[in-house]
Amino acid sequence: MKCVLVFTTALCLLSACTGVPQDIEPVTGFDQQRYLGTWYEIARLDHSFEEGLSRVTANYSLNDDGSIKVINRGYNAEEGQWQEADGRAVFVGDSDVGHLKVSFFGPFYASYVVFELDNQYSTAYITGYNRDYLWLMSRTPEVSEEALAAFKARAVAEGFDLTELILVAQ
């Protein structure tokens, strides 16, 4: 019985990691084909898996099984080398909703929620399963001051704490 309880608890915790923060809606009308390609990380709330990285990019392409291949890459100036993480993303529900789960470690998935995406697919606002995760991604290494201000305003309106926001050097 104890094993069943531990397994059930672990399952619940893992499924919580693929949820959506309360009151945040993933975009609808999401077009996977248009989203594929290279994105530059413009701003983020820092986490241990990206700590100290600059020149961060994410590249998305299709795997043979229909899932999305994810290659995240960033430069660690302290170590003087590039770091790369290969992962796999799949839609949590419908493929026209910007809510995916991504794994870099076997069966363990984390939420990837696109909650803002412009019509040209040139900028995207991303969060994880809670408001501790936030990214501004762009098709270009830089965005205008207006685009950055719009991102910050929307993030604050959605309840994100931006005191630890990092502008990523590209």
Question: Can you describe what each PLM-predicted range is?
Answer:
Residues C17-Q170:
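A beta-rich soluble binding module of mature secreted/lumenal proteins
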Residues L13-L14:
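Bacterial Sec-type N-terminal signal peptides, specifically the leucine/valine-rich hydrophobic h-region
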Residues M1-L5:
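Positively charged n-region of N-terminal signal peptides that target proteins for export
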